[in-house]
Swiss-Prot record:
Annotated InterPro entries: Flu_matrix_M1, Flu_matrix_M1_C, Flu_matrix_M1_N, Flu_matrix_M1_N_sub1, Flu_matrix_M1_N_sub2, INFV_M1
Name this protein carries in UniProt: Matrix protein 1
Gene: M
Family of this protein: Belongs to the influenza viruses Matrix protein M1 family.
Region (RNP-binding): 165-252
Length: 252
């Protein structure tokens, strides 16, 4: 796996799923391929994106700044500086300085990532802030190691939280989660169906599923009534894809 592929993988792992994630993935691909060279426009676009947390925006801004060539005097962006300030906690800043000194001695991506993983997310963000604000310099490879270590920590905590929700025994949370998943699956089906004639059937199934979820929420149904809803939808989607000559078995 190339370095940039690895960076893209880690960064995208902390972006919530949805159309915006696909858009960010495309921007990252363009930046890494050298196709997007207007850093200012890129940062303005990033700043106005909804849904993303300030820290995720800060990390993306840091990655764009590391990758896109820019004039020496280009202003640093406030939204990135604020996100990478470690919440203004002096402990984070102290640890960030210690980490920075260690990173100065590293020359490889994996070496830097290994060193960084033993620090807290706040210290890692502060260390990125030091580099972003030009208070310290490390090689691009080492900076990418720092980015990936931060993303790994964030993704770990997101995964723990997600696992807690999926394994919860609370029937109301499970019921709502199944309805949300069914609804987003239906939305994805509608987007994939496009405008072909065969698509009418898939659109019909998706639309009925969304109406059903709305009705279930309106009248308040038994928590077990949503069981299998998403799987039924996915079976319909796969049947539709088969007819269209597309074989994709990996949706479940």
């Amino acid at each position: 796996m190339s370095l940039l592929t690895e960076v893209e993988t880690y960064v995208l792992s902390i972006v919530p799923s949805g159309p915006l994630k696909a858009e960010i993935a495309q921007r990252l691909e363009d930046v890494f391929a050298g196709k997007n060279t207007d850093l200012e426009a890129l940062m303005e676009w990033l700043k106005t994106r909804p849904i993303l947390s300030p820290l995720t925006k800060g990390i993306l801004g840091f990655v764009f700044t590391l990758t896109v060539p820019s004039e020496r005097g280009l202003q640093r962006r406030r939204f990135v500086q604020n996100a990478l300030s470690g919440n203004g906690d002096p402990n984070n800043m102290d640890r960030a300085v210690k980490l920075y000194r260690k990173l100065k001695r590293e020359i490889t991506f994996h070496g830097a990532k290994e060193v960084a993983l033993s620090y807290s997310t706040g210290a890692l963000a502060s260390c990125m802030g030091l580099i972003y604000n030009r208070m310290g310099t490390v090689t691009t490879e080492v900076a990418f190691g720092l980015v990936c270590a931060t993303c790994e920590q964030i993704a770990d905590s997101q995964h723990r939280s997600h696992r807690q929700m999926v394994t919860t025994t609370n029937p109301l949370i499970r019921h709502e989660n199944r309805m949300v998943l069914a609804s987003t699956t239906a939305k994805a089906m509608e987007q994939m169906a496009g405008s072909s004639e065969q698509a009418a059937e898939a659109m019909e199934v998706a639309s009925k599923a969304r109406q059903m979820v709305q009705a279930m929420r309106t009248i308040g149904t038994h928590p077990s009534s949503s069981a299998g809803l998403k799987d039924d939808l996915l079976e319909n989607l796969q049947a539709y894809q088969k007819r269209m000559g597309v074989q994709m078995q990996r949706f479940k």
